């Protein structure tokens, strides 16, 4: 295994891990990078520089809930005749490191448990008559490939440092990596270097208590966070702690500018939602400096020491640039009157939806244990306590019967009729597939409001930690802009730059959405909803994607395609919302008909009020 000191390049990521080793209150380090970049090797090598005896626990992606948080050890309990508690992975990482490779692929239920443990510093185990609290105060180190999806925002909020980096492409560095892997390395030299590095980190931990940061430096970090569009006081605290830890590594007693720069680079910039405008250079300021104003006579009673009037400069700073024609076509999203709970209402009103809380379903494999039921051992996990309770009344009779036959028995005689299988409630998640009509007719109608509608619904999905997918349809076919993901911010960015123009391939949108839904179901997502933002005026057939000559199809053929797909989607149990963006005087009822074919809810966007939409959804 390659040691931490042997790893070539990745200096910023190594520095980040060293800061975490100095101050575990930074929460953790997340390293997003492409496959083969060495991120996982570096993360596992982090254990080399930690104090001796520090737990380093790797979490498998397929971890079950009882393995994650703990529960009753079935084998040990049956062997001893007394209940034996088994600690989960989270509590085993207490006072150490929990490492997760492919963090973005981790099950949402497991992510929720990790978030809860990081907030509490403990794991609460309540299952099968067991109620215990296990300490679980750990650092989280995660690596993932951004192409696999994004990491849940709630989890990133609890982690101080995010270090995206690209693979090493420098010739000398790559040659050094090959030589290291293929050649031999003096083990004594490696161990000496690791001991030295552990000593530096140990000294930095002691020095951390003696490092100070000024109010002006704290103010500068907070102002930088605001200018970058970074929200939340927790991030400000992480940035301050990162600066203090870096100063401690340098054995300094005061934070300097380099410490502040590193904190901004590791904590604030990866979370930036906007970039501040560049300050003009001195030359540019001299070129743009206006001529001096003509002298004016002093006003009576004017105070010579009064501060200059800042009204004009403030007004100049608040002026906004007028967008050009291209920016107008891009149409930034704006607020609309769609109610925030439209998604909840429509899911609740869908008759085919399962009962229970949003996005939750019962199963025999994973989630939160809610009850037991009779079943075979091979069909699920045995519910120990209910099984023992079921078997208890028959023990005397069964042992007597076995004794008559000369069969020796153990402490318990359990038959297949006694076996109870666990039933879990798993928040498998709701997937909202947004299909936005970006055709030319939409550009002339209500594209601005349409984008605003999607933006408000995306925010609702973010609050409930649902997954979203974004599909646009224009020209000859639909296009998946964002596969199913929990990254609402990425969906908003794709939406902001969505161009318009061309035909309306409505059938292609339905087919693409349906295929996306079917793929999601193979990954355990049970509730899916289509949200179609369109005027419903489809005019491009499916065949046009491969044969441009087929674009001019009869209207009847287009309607048959849409109707067949809509009926298939409806029969597949997928809920739908159709938001009509067409002007009243242009409408021929295309969008209401589409909603009817899908068996979904219909909303008219331009003049709709929240109360009207809620009333329509509940009727």
UniProtKB/Swiss-Prot annotation:
Q: Fetch the CDD domains from UniProt.
A: AAA, vWA_Magnesium_chelatase
> Quick one: which gene encodes this?
bchD
| Recorded superkingdom | Bacteria
Recorded hits in PROSITE patterns, A to Z, give: VWFA
So where does this one cross the membrane? Answer: none
Cited NCBIfam families: BchD-ChlD
Domain named VWFA: which ranges?
431-619
EC nos: 6.6.1.1
UniProt keyword annotation of Transferase present:
no
Identify the species of origin: Chlorobaculum parvum (strain DSM 263 / NCIMB 8327)
Q: Name one Pfam family in it.
A: VWA_2
Functional pathway: Porphyrin-containing compound metabolism; bacteriochlorophyll biosynthesis
Annotated InterPro entries: AAA+_ATPase, BchD/ChlD_VWA, ChlI/MoxR_AAA_lid, Mg_chelatase_ATPase-dsu, Mg_chelatse_chII-like_cat_dom, P-loop_NTPase, VWF_A, vWFA_dom_sf
Q: GO biological process annotations for this chain's record?
A: bacteriochlorophyll biosynthetic process; photosynthesis
- Any idea what this protein is called? Magnesium-chelatase 67 kDa subunit
* Principal EC category: ligase
Ranges of biased composition (kind: Acidic residues): 280-321
């Amino acid at each position: 295994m390659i040691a931490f000191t042997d790893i070539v390049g990745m200096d910023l990521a190594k520095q980040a891990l060293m800061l975490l080793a100095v101050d575990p209150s930074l929460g953790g380090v997340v390293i997003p990078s492409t496959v083969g970049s060495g991120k996982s090797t570096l993360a596992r090598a982090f254990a080399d520089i930690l104090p001796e005896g520090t737990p380093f626990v790797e979490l498998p992606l397929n971890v079950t809930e009882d393995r994650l948080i703990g529960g009753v050890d079935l084998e040990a309990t049956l062997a001893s005749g007394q209940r034996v508690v088994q600690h989960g992975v989270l509590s085993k990482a207490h006072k150490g490191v929990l490492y997760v490779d492919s963090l973005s692929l981790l099950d949402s239920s497991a992510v929720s448990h990790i978030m809860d443990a990081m907030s509490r510093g403990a794991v609460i185990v309540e299952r099968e008559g067991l109620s215990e609290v296990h300490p679980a105060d750990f650092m989280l180190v995660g690596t993932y490939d951004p192409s696999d999806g994004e990491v849940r925002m709630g989890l990133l909020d609890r982690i101080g440092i995010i270090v995206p980096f690209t693979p090493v492409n420098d010739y000398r560095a790559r040659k050094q990596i090959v030589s290291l892997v293929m050649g031999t390395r003096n083990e004594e030299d490696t161990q000496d270097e690791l001991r030295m590095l552990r000593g530096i980190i140990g000294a930095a931990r002691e020095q951390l208590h003696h490092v100070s940061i000024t109010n002006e430096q704290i103010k500068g970090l907070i102002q930088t966070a605001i200018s970058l569009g970074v929200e939340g006081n927790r991030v400000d605290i992480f940035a301050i702690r990162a600066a203090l830890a870096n100063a401690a590594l340098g054995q300094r007693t005061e934070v300097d500018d380099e410490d502040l720069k590193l904190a901004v680079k590791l904590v604030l910039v990866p979370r930036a939602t906007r970039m501040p405008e560049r300050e003009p250079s001195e030359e540019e300021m001299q070129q743009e400096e206006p001529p001096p104003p003509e002298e004016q006579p002093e006003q009576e009673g004017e105070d010579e020491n009064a501060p200059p009037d800042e009204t004009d400069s403030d007004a100049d700073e608040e002026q906004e640039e007028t967008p050009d024609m291209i920016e107008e076509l891009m149409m930034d999203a704006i607020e609309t009157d769609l109610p925030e709970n439209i998604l909840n209402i429509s899911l609740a009103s869908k008759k085919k939806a399962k009962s229970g809380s949003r996005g939750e379903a019962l199963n025999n494999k994973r989630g939160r244990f809610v009850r037991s039921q009779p079943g075979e051992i091979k069909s699920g996990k045995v519910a120990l306590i209910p099984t023992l309770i079921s078997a208890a009344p028959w023990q005397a009779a069964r042992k007597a019967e076995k004794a008559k036959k000369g069969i020796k028995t153990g402490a318990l005689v359990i038959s297949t009729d006694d076996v109870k299988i666990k039933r879990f409630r798993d928040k498998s998640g709701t997937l909202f597939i947004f299909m936005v009509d970006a055709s030319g007719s939409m550009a002339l109608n209500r594209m601005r409001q349409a984008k605003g509608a999607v933006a408000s619904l995306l925010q609702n999905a973010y609050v409930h930690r649902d997954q979203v997918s974004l599909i646009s349809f224009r020209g000859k076919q639909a296009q998946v802009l964002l596969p199913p993901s929990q990254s609402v911010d990425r969906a908003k960015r794709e939406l902001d730059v969505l161009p318009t123009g061309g035909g309306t391939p409505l059938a292609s949108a339905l087919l693409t959405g349906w295929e996306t839904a079917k793929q999601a179901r193979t990954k355990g997502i049970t509730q899916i909803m289509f949200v179609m933002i369109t005027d419903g005026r489809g005019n491009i057939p499916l065949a046009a994607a491969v044969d441009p000559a087929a674009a001019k199809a009869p209207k009847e053929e287009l309607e048959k395609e849409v109707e067949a797909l809509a009926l298939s989607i409806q029969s597949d149990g997928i809920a739908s919302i159709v938001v009509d963006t067409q002007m009243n005087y242009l409408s021929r009822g295309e969008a209401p008909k589409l909603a009817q074919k899908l068996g979904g809810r219909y909303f008219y966007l331009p003049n709709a009020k929240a109360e009207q939409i809620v009333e329509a959804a509940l009727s």
